[in-house]
C-alpha cells in the first residue's frame, strides 16, 4: 500500500512537471491504527487557489524516498497535527503532553532539513511551525495553559477554524508584515508553542500573551494559525499561500 501511495505521489509530480505551475509538497498526517496518510483538503484547496500544484507527501521510513520527492518539488508545506515528541529537543514528556506520532516527527525533520539544505521555500503551519523549530535546533513549550505566559488567553478555540479568535501583533519589516500588515485576527488550535528559537530563526508575530505566532528564517515562513481554513471568509489569508507560490516560482527558475 505504501509503495502504491508513493507511486501515485511520483505520478502527480511527473504530471505537474509538464506544467508551468510550481509543485508544492504538502506533508501529511499518519494513522497507525488504519495505516493511512491524510491531510485536510483546505491545504490542497489553498495551494490550488494560490496558483500552485499540490503534491501530497506521505510518511515513508525510507529517507531516500524523501530525498527523491524533495528533488522534485518547488516548495514545502508542513501541515498541522499532533504534538512533537520532546525527545527530539532533549526533554521528557510533561504530564500535559498530548497525542504524538514519532514516525511523523522523524520523517518531517528529514524533509525540513533537506528543504533547507536545498534552499527550497518552506511554509509551516501550526504543528509545522513547531516541528520546523525543533528540526533546526530549537525547543518547545509543551503546554501553554500550564506555562508562565500572561495574561492568559485561549489558544484552543471551540468555534470553527474559519473564525478568527484572537489578535496578533506582527513585526514591521518581516515577510508576514508585508503580507498582512501590523495586526491580524487569527484562528487558534494549539497548546504547544516555540520556546527556544532555532539558530537563524526570528519571531515575527506574537499573541497578546507573548506566545509566538509566527517565525521566519531564510526561505522559511512559519505561522501558528491556519490561514488555509480562514481565507474563504477572510481573503487576505490566502496571500500567505500566494506568497509561497511566488517564492516557489522563483525557486523553479533556478
Predicted regions and their residues:
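Catalytic nucleophile loop
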Residues: 76-78, 107, 113-139, 226
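Glycine-rich beta-strand-to-loop/alpha-helix junction loops that act as flexible
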Residues: 28, 79-81
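Glycine/Thr-rich phosphate-binding loops of Rossmann-like dinucleotide-binding domains
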Residues: 34, 85-87
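Sec-dependent signal peptide recognition
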Residues: 2-8
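Amide-donor transfer/coupling interface in amidating biosynthetic enzymes
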Residues: 20-74, 101-118, 145-254
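Short, solvent-exposed loop/turn and secondary-structure capping segments
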Residues: 88-89, 135-136, 144-145
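A short, gly/pro- and small-residue-rich
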Residues: 88-106
Amino acid at each position: 500500500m505504501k509503495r502504491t501511495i508513493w507511486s501515485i505521489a511520483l505520478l502527480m509530480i511527473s504530471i505537474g512537471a509538464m506544467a508551468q505551475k510550481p509543485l508544492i509538497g504538502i506533508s501529511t498526517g499518519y494513522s497507525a491504527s488504519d495505516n493511512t496518510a491524510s491531510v485536510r483538503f483546505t491545504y490542497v484547496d489553498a495551494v490550488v487557489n494560490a496558483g500552485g500544484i499540490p503534491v501530497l507527501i506521505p510518511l515513508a521510513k525510507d529517507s531516500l524516498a524523501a530525498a527523491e520527492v524533495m528533488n522534485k518539488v518547488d516548495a514545502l508545506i508542513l501541515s498541522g497535527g499532533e504534538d512533537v515528541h520532546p525527545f527530539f529537543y532533549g526533554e521528557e514528556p510533561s504530564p500535559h503532553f498530548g497525542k504524538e506520532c514519532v514516525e511523523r516527527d522523524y520523517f518531517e525533520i528529514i524533509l525540513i532539513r533537506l528543504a533547507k539544505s536545498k534552499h527550497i521555500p518552506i511554509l509551516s503551519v501550526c504543528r509545522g511551525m513547531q516541528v520546523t523549530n525543533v528540526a533546526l535546533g530549537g525547543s518547545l513549550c509543551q503546554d501553554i495553559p500550564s506555562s508562565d505566559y500572561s495574561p492568559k488567553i485561549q489558544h484552543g478555540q471551540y468555534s470553527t477554524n474559519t473564525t478568527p479568535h484572537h489578535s496578533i501583533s506582527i513585526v514591521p519589516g518581516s515577510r508576514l508584515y508585508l503580507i498582512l500588515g501590523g495586526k491580524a485576527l487569527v484562528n487558534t488550535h494549539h497548546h504547544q508553542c516555540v520556546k527556544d528559537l532555532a539558530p537563524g530563526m526570528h519571531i515575527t508575530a506574537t499573541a497578546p500573551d507573548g506566545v509566538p505566532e509566527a517565525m521566519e528564517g531564510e526561505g522559511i515562513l512559519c505561522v501558528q494559525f491556519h490561514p488555509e481554513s480562514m481565507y474563504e471568509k477572510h481573503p487576505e489569508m490566502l496571500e500567505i499561500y500566494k506568497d509561497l507560490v511566488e517564492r516557489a516560482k522563483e525557486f523553479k527558475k533556478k
